[in-house]
Structures are given as structure tokens and as C-alpha cells.
Regions:
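Conserved N-terminal structural module of periplasmic/extracytoplasmic solute-binding proteins
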Residues: 2-104, 110, 289-292, 313-317, ...
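Extracytoplasmic/periplasmic substrate-recognition and gating elements
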Residues: 62, 67, 234-238, 242-243, ...
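Hinge/lid segment of periplasmic solute-binding proteins
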Residues: 99-149, 160, 165-171, 185, ...
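Short, solvent-exposed loop/beta-turn-alpha elements that line the ligand-binding surface or hinge
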Residues: 115-126, 180-189, 209-229, 275, ...
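Long, aromatic- and glycine/proline-rich binding clefts that accommodate carbohydrate-like moieties
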Residues: 129-131, 335-387, 391, 415-416
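Extracytoplasmic/periplasmic solute-binding protein
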Residues: 139-149, 169-218, 260
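Glycine-centered hinge/linker elements that transmit conformational signals in sensory
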Residues: 171-173, 215-245
């Protein structure tokens, strides 16, 4: 074979090889393009994301034709971003979070009713509190129950947790001032993010109050609000068992560093304290002696809602993904790693949950709580409570005046919201 013919054959062979590679690459691109893509927006912390990703990876291994991506967003960014995107006909297929976002999303008509998408027999496996119904429709299916506050205590400093407000104050004084009751020890008996209204709720309920009635009207100008405000101000200014100032981060650091014996914090914090090497206990918040009522927190399931704009070709896979993430083994994995309360009824009665001290006491606290309202008016109430509550702490307003002003401002904000 002459040189020119050899070159010709070589060139033709090379051309076929390149063409084959191009076709193969094009086929891969088409395969990637043709995969069903599902996106989940959430506001969960890093350790929750790690568990979720492991579960998503298992789902994608079972279903290679589907690609699922999780995307973290801060709470306000998620809510406003989802509203804007969904109103424009876009956004993630699934939005995950606490139940209080359901009211605003339903008002905008940007999430789908779920009761006809999932079989009632399948739904019956889960705690009814984890199924968020609003205005006659099911809008969220939760895999985690709680998002609630409890009393967390350092067992080295507090061997036995208090069960009443009087015991809380007594232990707090001993930790803060020592046996003689006068010399500061350099630590506080108790700390928490008490300047925020959400963290005020346990004492409001302990004195017999709540934020709204069944019709969504604020119920802040009450004796319960006044007494709860007085209690918090007293343990700070008279008993001096809590810091003079404390936001969430300050309280968290004080407790982690052993400079506070107890902290009021949510179920999201427990795994972090354990990983930091603290020997912690979790206990129900105390009973108020004068009322005989337990300090109850707002309880909010965290779960899945579906975008109103979900394309028909993705519906099958979105439903399959939610069913997969709700499986007993996946909820158990989350419970073991994160100490979250599962919504699967059989898991709630399982040996692991019943024998784990943290989860057992978490369940008791949940039973003392009330579901967080999902109506949009709740946001107006939070915003109305904050300035007067902080005025009481600053000493510029009496508890009585603050309760009155909270009510007036909440009613005004709700009127403005509904105009």
C-alpha cells in the first residue's frame, strides 16, 4: 500500500473514531437532558443536609432516570423567593419547611392540595399533627414533628432538672451565686434567646395565654401576657439568674462553654450540643406553680409541599420521592442522627424512641404544646409583639401597657395586611 493510500485509510479510520466519540457524547448529553430533574428548597442546617443527601443518593441509585438536587436557602429568602418564583410559573418542585409557611403559600395559591395525590391509607401511617390541613385541604406532609423548645441542661451542673418555675429559680440562684447566695460564680443558672417573641411563648402559655383565638384574632392584651412579662423581667432584674442581654448566639455560646447550667432551645440544637462533647439532658419546660399549667411551646411539623406549577411529566416522580423520604427506615435514620421526632406512628412507639431519654422527654414536651398557627396573621402578631416586649425589657414600658400596645398594633397590622 502506498503512502497516500495509508494516509487515506488512517484518515478515514480516525474520522469514524471521532464521529463515534461525538455520537457517544451526544447520546450522553441527550441522556442527561432527558433525565427528570427535581429540586427541593429547604432551610435546614448542615447536619440535616448531610442526612438528606444520603437519602437522595439512594433514591437516585434506585431511579437513575431521575436527578434530585437540594438547595439551601435562609428562611426569609426561601419564603419570598418561592412566592416570587411560583407566581412567575417557576420555582422548585418541592418546598420543605415548618408548617407556618403554609398559610402565606396558600393565600398566594402557589402550592397544591395533596389529599387526592396520596392514598388515605398511606397517610394514616403518620401522626395527624404531621399532616397540615388548611381551609379544607392537605398542603403539607411532614417527616419530622416538633421544631419545639425544651429545657436543655448540663448534667455536670444540673444533675436533676427542675419541674416547676420555683425549682427553676432555686437551681438558677444556686448556679449563679453559689451556696451563700451572694457571690457570683461567673456563670448563669439559665440562658436563652429571651428577647425574641417565639422564645417568650412557653411562659405565655404557662400563665394561661395564647397568641390568637380560633378566628385568628390576636389575644395579647390579657393577664397571662402581663404575668409572663413580669416573670421574665423578674428573673433577669431581681433574681439575676439570666444574662442582662442575650441573643441566640450569645445564649448558645454561654451554654456550650459551660457558663450556663440550663438553656431553653429547640430540637434543632441537641445534636450540636452532643457533638460539642456536652453531657446534656432534655426535659420538659417547667410547670408554673400559680396556674398549675406546663410551659407549652408552639409545635410545628416540618415537611413537604408541592409547587402548583409542577409539570405533569414530573408528578409521578415527585410523589415517588416524597413516599421514599417518608419511609420508616429514612425517618429512623434522621431520628438517630438528629434526635428529631418522626411522624411515622410505628416509629414513635419503637424501642429506640421510647428508651432514648432525649426523645422520650421531647415527646412529653410536644404533648404539652400547641400546634403553631399556619394563618398569615401570625407574622403580623410576631411583628406586633416584638417592640413592646423589648420595651419592657428595656424598662421603658410597663407589662400592662406593653400587653395593650401589642394587641392594638397586631390588630392594626392585620387590617393593613388584609386591605
Amino acid at each position: 500500500m502506498n503512502r497516500s493510500r495509508r494516509y487515506s485509510v488512517t484518515a478515514i479510520g480516525t474520522a469514524f473514531l471521532i464521529a463515534g466519540m461525538i455520537l457517544s457524547m451526544d447520546g450522553c448529553r441527550r441522556s442527561s437532558v432527558n433525565r427528570i430533574r427535581i429540586t427541593i428548597w429547604h432551610q435546614d442546617r448542615i447536619d440535616v443536609r448531610v442526612v438528606l443527601q444520603a437519602q437522595l443518593d439512594r433514591f437516585m441509585k434506585l431511579h437513575p432516570e431521575v436527578r434530585v438536587e437540594q438547595l439551601f436557602k435562609e428562611t426569609e429568602e426561601l419564603r419570598s423567593g418561592f412566592i416570587i418564583a411560583a407566581l412567575a410559573g417557576q420555582g422548585p418542585e418541592i418546598v420543605y419547611g415548618p408548617s407556618d409557611q403554609i398559610g402565606p403559600f396558600e393565600a398566594m395559591k402557589i402550592i397544591q392540595p395533596l389529599e387526592k395525590l396520596f392514598d388515605s391509607a398511606w397517610l394514616s401511617q403518620y401522626d395527624p399533627i404531621g399532616l397540615t390541613w388548611y381551609r379544607g385541604h392537605l398542603y403539607q406532609i411532614a417527616d419530622k414533628l416538633g421544631n419545639h423548645l425544651t429545657l436543655v441542661y448540663n448534667k455536670k451542673l444540673v444533675p436533676v432538672p427542675p419541674s416547676t418555675d420555683e425549682q427553676l429559680e432555686a437551681i438558677g440562684r444556686k448556679l449563679t451565686f453559689g451556696p451563700d447566695g451572694t457571690t457570683r460564680t461567673g456563670r448563669y443558672g439559665l440562658t436563652w434567646n429571651y428577647t425574641e417573641p417565639f422564645f417568650f411563648i412557653p411562659f405565655l402559655t404557662g400563665f394561661g395565654g395564647w397568641v390568637m383565638d380560633d378566628s385568628g384574632r390576636p389575644t395579647l392584651d390579657t393577664r397571662a401576657t402581663v404575668e409572663a412579662l413580669k416573670f421574665i423581667k423578674r428573673i433577669r432584674d431581681v433574681d439575676k439568674i439570666i444574662p442582662n442581654e442575650a441573643d441566640y448566639n450569645i445564649a448558645d455560646i454561654l451554654f456550650k462553654d459551660g457558663n450556663a447550667g440550663m438553656i431553653i432551645n429547640g430540637d434543632w440544637s441537641w445534636s450540636g450540643y452532643l457533638k460539642a462533647g456536652l453531657d446534656i439532658g432534655v426535659a420538659p419546660l417547667p410547670k408554673i406553680t400559680s396556674t398549675g399549667l406546663w410551659c407549652g411551646t408552639m409545635v410545628a411539623p416540618k415537611g413537604f409541599s408541592i409547587n402548583i406549577n409542577l409539570p405533569e411529566e414530573k408528578k409521578k416522580w415527585v410523589l415517588e420521592l416524597i413516599r421514599f423520604l417518608m419511609l420508616e427506615e429514612n425517618q429512623l435514620e434522621s431520628t438517630k442522627e438528629l434526635f428529631t421526632m418522626p411522624t411515622d406512628l410505628s416509629l414513635q412507639q419503637s424501642e429506640f424512641v421510647q428508651q432514648n431519654e432525649i426523645l422520650r422527654n421531647s415527646k412529653i414536651q410536644i404533648s404539652h404544646g400547641r400546634p403553631m398557627p399556619v394563618v398569615p396573621e401570625l407574622r403580623a402578631i410576631w411583628d406586633a409583639m416584638r417592640p413592646s416586649y423589648q420595651d419592657v425589657l428595656a424598662g421603658t414600658k410597663t407589662p400592662e401597657q406593653a400587653a395593650h400596645d401589642m394587641q392594638v398594633l397586631a390588630e392594626q397590622r392585620i387590617r393593613d395586611m388584609n386591605e
